[in-house]
Amino acid sequence: MHALDALDALSIKADIPDFSPGDTVRVYVNITEGDRSRVQVFQGVVIARRGFGVRQTFTVRKISFQVGVERIFPLHSPSINRIEVVTKGSVRRAKLYYIRKLRGKKAKVKQKREL
């Protein structure tokens, strides 16, 4: 198992910002189509984080043309170019799955106040 731990340590990214469920993030993902490569931006609310170490993932939800879209990203994936935290949210839960049922202004996450 020590060899696997060493391999995991090499794959962990160091430039990941501190974010939690309720925060609005902008994820820049490298998309390769044939011989061309481009960067796609996915911005939404983090509704869950799970896993530990290299296997850690986070789920981002956004509304696109009145349809909810969720995407699960591996945190240490090489296809993720960078992650930006747009706003910090104030929530009392670790998993925000209840937001899936809410519509309109009720689906908003309250912004955390700066002290």
UniProtKB/Swiss-Prot annotation:
It comes from the Bacteria. The keyword Ribonucleoprotein applies. GO terms for biological process: translation. GO terms for molecular function: structural constituent of ribosome. SUPFAM superfamilies: Translation proteins SH3-like domain. One of its GO terms (cellular component) is cytosolic large ribosomal subunit. Keywords: Ribonucleoprotein, Ribosomal protein. This protein is located at the 30S-50S ribosomal subunit interface and may play a role in the structure and function of the aminoacyl-tRNA binding site. PANTHER family: LARGE RIBOSOMAL SUBUNIT PROTEIN BL19M, RIBOSOMAL PROTEIN L19. This is Large ribosomal subunit protein bL19. It comes from Tropheryma whipplei (strain Twist).
